[in-house]
Structure formats: C-alpha cells, structure tokens
Amino acid sequence: MSGFLEELLGDKLVTGGGEEVDVHSLGARGIALLGLYFGCSLSAPCAQLSASLAAFYGRLRGDAAAGPGAGAGAGAAAEPEPRHRLEIVFVSSDQDQRQWQDFVRDMPWLALPYKEKHRKLKLWNKYRVSNIPSLIFLDATTGKVVCRNGLLVIRDDPEGLEFPWGPKPFREVIAGPLLRNNGQSLESSSLEGSHVGVYFSAHWCPPCRSLTRVLVESYRKIKEAGQEFEIIFVSADRSEESFKQYFSEMPWLAVPYTDEARRSRLNRLYGIQGIPTLIVLDPQGEVITRQGRVEVLNDEDCREFPWHPKPVLELSDSNAVQLNEGPCLVLFVDSEDDGESEAAKQLIQPIAEKIIAKYKAKEEEAPLLFFVAGEDDMTDSLRDYTNLPEAAPLLTILDMSARAKYVMDVEEITPAIVETFVNDFLAEKLKPEPI
C-alpha cells in the first residue's frame, strides 16, 4: 500500500504543527481510506469546510477531541485506535507560504508540504479538480477513487455510518418513483433496457437553460429514430417552485424535488462539480460518457448517439472547455488542405488508444486528452493565448492549469515522434515553457 501512497504523495507530509511525517508510516498504520482535500486559505468556503471537516474527521477516527489539534498532529503514541481507518491530506493552491502556514496550523490532518508545488499540480490534474473546496476519497490500497464528492458525504453522513462510501450501482441509487411534468409517476424500473441521460441542471443557471433548449430537440430526434432513451433531471434548483417552472419545459423524467437524499446520492455517485452536466449511461447503467453536454452540442442531428468517446477529438467551440480539465495533446494542422484533419487524427489515434486502454485497465482516467486543431477563429485565439508559432503541423501538449506548454516543432510528424513525445511527457522528461 505504501508504494502507491509514496508515488502519489511523495516521501514526506507535514502536520499542522510543522512536523514531518513519513508517508510510508501511513501504510503501517493500516489506513483504509485517503481523503484529498483541495483548498486555499483565501477561500471563505474552504475556511467553513475546514471547521466542519475537523469535527467529521475526529468523529470517524474516534479521537478524544474532534477539534483543531486532535489527530494527526497530536502525536502517534497518544493516538487512540481509529474507529475508521481514515486519513486526510490537504492539497493547497496557496501562493503565499505564510498564509498557507496560518491556514494549516489548526488542521488535525496532514498536508502536502508547501514546497511540493509540482506534485500539487499533478494531483489537481490527475483528479480533474475544477473548483475548491473539493474532497476526494481514495482507496488507500489500490488508489481507486471511491467518492469524488466528499463534501456531500460530510453533509449526508456526518456520523460515518456508510463508511467507506464506495460507489453503488446506478439502479440501486435511482430506485424509487420518477416524475413527468404532468404529475404522472413512474417507477425507476421503467428505465430497464434504455440508455439513460442523467441531467444535472438548474433554472438559475443560464448555461443550463441554453443546453436544455438544445437537449429537448436532441431528445425528440433520438426518440423519433426509435432509440430506447430516457433522461432524468436531477435538480439543483433553490426552491420547489423554481424546479416546477424549469421542469415544465422538459419532456423527460425527474427525481422528485422533495427527494433531496436521492438527488444528493446521484451527485455523489458521479462526483458532480458543476452544472450543466449530462452523464450518458448504457442499458446496464455503466457510464458511456461524462461529456454529454459537449456531445449534444457537437452532434446536432444525434447521428453518433449514444456518443461513445472518441480517442481523438477535433477541437471546436463546444469542446474547447475540455482544454481546462487537464493536460491535452493538440496537433495543429493546416485544415485548408483536403483531408488534413482526418489524416492527423489517424496519425495520433494509435497512441491515444494505447494510453486510454492502459489507464482504463487501472480504472483511472487517461492523463491526456487528444485533439486535432484546424484553422479557425477559436484555434487562432488558442495560439495567441498560448503564444504558439504559426507553424503547421505543430505538435503540442498544453497544460492550462499549470500554465505550461510543451512544443515539438518538426517538419514531419510521425507516429513514432508522437509516441516518444507523449511518453517523455508522462515520464516528466520534457521541459515546460510558460504560457
């Protein structure tokens, strides 16, 4: 177990009091679950979370005192046998060391050392963290993600009765009545044999309302084509009145607004960090894509439904948002040449498929997304923003969160060059240039 933890966290962590702790010792203590707490001292929501998380942490570990100073920083000799084998590690985005020190001082758990900035960025990218505070629970033995939305765990299970909060099958989580906007109620068993879109949305969110208008047409086209497809609206509205107003525009099903527990469990199951989000499931309840929003906007006629992920995407206005989700390989080409974009996709597809398959076997998300970019206004803006040369073809890896780029500017790009470039990046052999 300690091998995984050391690979993830490095050799040393620190307590709130500044004492170093060997990561290897976590394995010896039999930690079953690791919580990664992504936050920042300047964030008011993070300050609020730290207080409630300290009480939660103390209760689950069975510490004599659940407040600041108990637990990790209190000394191993005096620490009681934990009721639940849980450890939390704070991963900060602070830019000022003094502010970081003041913030972690009262934390009863451990923290990644301030100087480990590169490792912090790797963790943010690895787990696709898009906002703070964020709390992700991992199996400390296998490294597999157990729960992406630990904030809801704290709210929904403050006593830790459902520990270790592992994912449950969709059919189990969705079980219960579903509504149509005419008041008709259907059992969730009516979904059997259908592809399902789980739609997290709210009326107060303008991008949600825009997507809903498009999604209504997509839903109609898919149904008219004879496909077995249903959408379930999981509301994030702030009142039942707002929910009813918004739901009146939707021809599909919804989890009742009053069933807050089921709505929360669905958010936990899919680790929802923002809306709108459309998760598309196969008839067995397995995730086909988490990028339903992008797929619907890119495929107006729904010809590619149910939108199985493509190893290489053609960069567009609707999927450019994915550039912010982690490192992306982008091959810029001269799209004025007939067939250039398709040839470029075929060029990088083998290595993309190889990387995706490798990480899928480990039940992890691939560490890179793969794009081909032609010539249009959006691509020009991307080149300008990242200060890239106008050359084509141009092979790059862009890491927006780290504000870093890696450029392979050669006359001819071959599959071997692409594979070497990707492998060197993953092995951290490439020197980044600032964006």
UniProtKB/Swiss-Prot annotation:
<dbReference type="InterPro" id="IPR036249">
    <property type="entry name" value="Thioredoxin-like_sf"/>
</dbReference>
<dbReference type="GO" id="GO:0030154">
    <property type="term" value="P:cell differentiation"/>
</dbReference>
<keyword id="KW-0520">NAD</keyword>
<feature type="modified residue" description="N-acetylserine">
    <location>
        <position position="2"/>
    </location>
</feature>
<keyword id="KW-0217">Developmental protein</keyword>
<dbReference type="InterPro" id="IPR041861">
    <property type="entry name" value="NRX_PDI_b"/>
</dbReference>
<keyword id="KW-0879">Wnt signaling pathway</keyword>
<dbReference type="Pfam" id="PF13905">
    <property type="entry name" value="Thioredoxin_8"/>
</dbReference>
<keyword id="KW-0963">Cytoplasm</keyword>
<dbReference type="GO" id="GO:0016055">
    <property type="term" value="P:Wnt signaling pathway"/>
</dbReference>
<keyword id="KW-0539">Nucleus</keyword>
<dbReference type="GO" id="GO:0005829">
    <property type="term" value="C:cytosol"/>
</dbReference>
<keyword id="KW-0560">Oxidoreductase</keyword>
<dbReference type="GO" id="GO:0001701">
    <property type="term" value="P:in utero embryonic development"/>
</dbReference>
<protein>
    <recommendedName>
        <fullName>Nucleoredoxin</fullName>
        <ecNumber>1.8.1.8</ecNumber>
    </recommendedName>
</protein>
<dbReference type="InterPro" id="IPR045870">
    <property type="entry name" value="TryX_NRX_thioredoxin_dom"/>
</dbReference>
<keyword id="KW-0007">Acetylation</keyword>
<dbReference type="InterPro" id="IPR012336">
    <property type="entry name" value="Thioredoxin-like_fold"/>
</dbReference>
<dbReference type="GO" id="GO:0030178">
    <property type="term" value="P:negative regulation of Wnt signaling pathway"/>
</dbReference>
<comment type="subunit">
    <text>Associates with the phosphatase 2A holoenzyme. Interacts with PPP2CA; the interaction is direct. Interacts with DVL1 (via PDZ domain); the interaction is direct and regulated by oxidative stress.</text>
</comment>
<dbReference type="Pfam" id="PF13848">
    <property type="entry name" value="Thioredoxin_6"/>
</dbReference>
<comment type="function">
    <text>Functions as a redox-dependent negative regulator of the Wnt signaling pathway, possibly by preventing ubiquitination of DVL3 by the BCR(KLHL12) complex. May also function as a transcriptional regulator act as a regulator of protein phosphatase 2A (PP2A).</text>
</comment>
<dbReference type="GO" id="GO:0072359">
    <property type="term" value="P:circulatory system development"/>
</dbReference>
<feature type="domain" description="Thioredoxin">
    <location>
        <begin position="167"/>
        <end position="314"/>
    </location>
</feature>
<dbReference type="GO" id="GO:0005634">
    <property type="term" value="C:nucleus"/>
</dbReference>
<dbReference type="GO" id="GO:0031397">
    <property type="term" value="P:negative regulation of protein ubiquitination"/>
</dbReference>
<comment type="similarity">
    <text>Belongs to the nucleoredoxin family.</text>
</comment>
<dbReference type="GO" id="GO:0004791">
    <property type="term" value="F:thioredoxin-disulfide reductase (NADPH) activity"/>
</dbReference>
<dbReference type="InterPro" id="IPR013766">
    <property type="entry name" value="Thioredoxin_domain"/>
</dbReference>
<keyword id="KW-0221">Differentiation</keyword>
